[in-house]
């Protein structure tokens, strides 16, 4: 597991450090270390993995810790077992993932790390592939620069120069129409992704949780 995380096979993220840190502490104090609640889970239906390119499959890479925790809390509030419910859960952070939870399994979800789904405060989300590959092969950008446009310097940061929601709210309240419009663009894309998950669940949705 340590070797797997050190090469970032599914993308660079701070959560990859968890097991490495745990192992270092455990080795130092000669104690066992465990993964109890995984950072990511893969419960996707096979049909959700396929794309129009046989070489590329969709991956289950999302904010599983938060989505699962929120699902359990919501189930308690609804006085039902998580494994009896169909839920749509939207994690709204620096990255945004929206999952279709069917009877305790996340059967489809956007990959918030690799530019799948809505734009977020600092990620581009899905973009048309034609203009993207023209950018990639234009000679004007390095691979690292393209990656930053997708992850870290995309979304609200790319348009408004900040990922700070409080600052953007102040700008909107002061009459900044560009900030208002771009924020609405992000909200539109989130709502669209939620609607997509409703289709995955065949319209049988017990709750939408944001």
Identify the function of each model-found stretch.
Residues 19-25, 35, 42, 50, ...:
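Glycine-rich phosphate-binding loop plus the immediately following alpha-helix
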Residues 1-18, 40-49:
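Short beta-strand-loop/turn "lid" adjacent to the catalytic site in phosphate-handling enzymes
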Residues 205-210:
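Glycine-rich phosphate-binding loops at beta-strand->alpha-helix junctions
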Residues 91:
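Phosphate/pyrophosphate-binding catalytic cores of soluble transferases and nucleic-acid-acting enzymes
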Residues 148, 152-203:
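Adenine-nucleotide phosphate-binding core of ATP-dependent small-molecule kinases
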Residues 2-5, 49-54, 170-178:
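Gly-rich Lys/Arg/Thr-decorated short loops/hinges at beta-loop-alpha junctions or inter-strand turns
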